[in-house]
Amino acid sequence: MKTKGYAALSAKSALVPYEFNRRSLRPRDVALDIYYAGICHSDIHQAREEWGPSIFPMVPGHEIVGKVIEIGSQASKFKVGELIGVGVFVDSCRICSSCLAGLEQYCLEGMTGTYNALERDGKTVAYGGYCDKFVIDEDYAVHVPQNLDLAGVAPLMCAGITLYPPLKNWNAGPGKKVGVMGLGGLGHMGVKFANALGAETTVFSHSPSKELDAKKMGSVS
């Protein structure tokens, strides 16, 4: 599948237009037109090789939202025309205890990153969401409600996913208290999630100017 995007050709280069081919659909794959791809600071770290050696050319982007345009012969979770989200990983071993428990992010063999990674065959480079099309196994994508602002949904695929699991793991809800350290890109989502779950939420911050915003989002203090 011919795809147009933007890539870093080296750790010192700016992003430049880049064309490449997505894989042909496997039986359980879905293909999507990308509508939005958020910019995460980790994209910059990886493109600049600040977290270790990177794979170039690199097409960054792991906060992806789009519309399904094609499905594989055995795909059943999505229909053409539905909205879909893709986050920070696109595959895992599927057989370890973590994967079997639905915790693929903790795959004992290591999950496959959305970009700057090799797919499970050990040779195919994974390209991210700074482009117009994407192909992914349906088990590693999520449904997106039709009534949401897609520009706001894209960051949920990273920042939102980062905050939600600990709240779920500790059963945040009515009768529970949640403390959020800082009210930045991650913190504000933590406040909103905890408040929506019914927990009593407190923000800890060095910036008194953020108190009003915190309370508007549902923090009690």
Report the location of each language-model feature.
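Short N-terminal binding/cap micro-motifs at the start of the first secondary-structure element
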Residues: K12-P17, H41-S42
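Short Gly/Pro-enriched turn/cap motifs at secondary-structure boundaries
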Residues: N21-R22, I55-G61, D121-A126, D132
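Glycine-rich beta-strand-centered segment in the early N-terminal region that forms part
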Residues: R23-A37, E50-L100, Q105, P145-N147
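Cysteine-cluster motifs in flexible loop/terminal segments that predominantly coordinate metals
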Residues: V88-D139
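Mid-domain Rossmann-like dinucleotide-binding core that forms the NAD(H)/NADP(H) cofactor-binding site
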Residues: Q146-S221
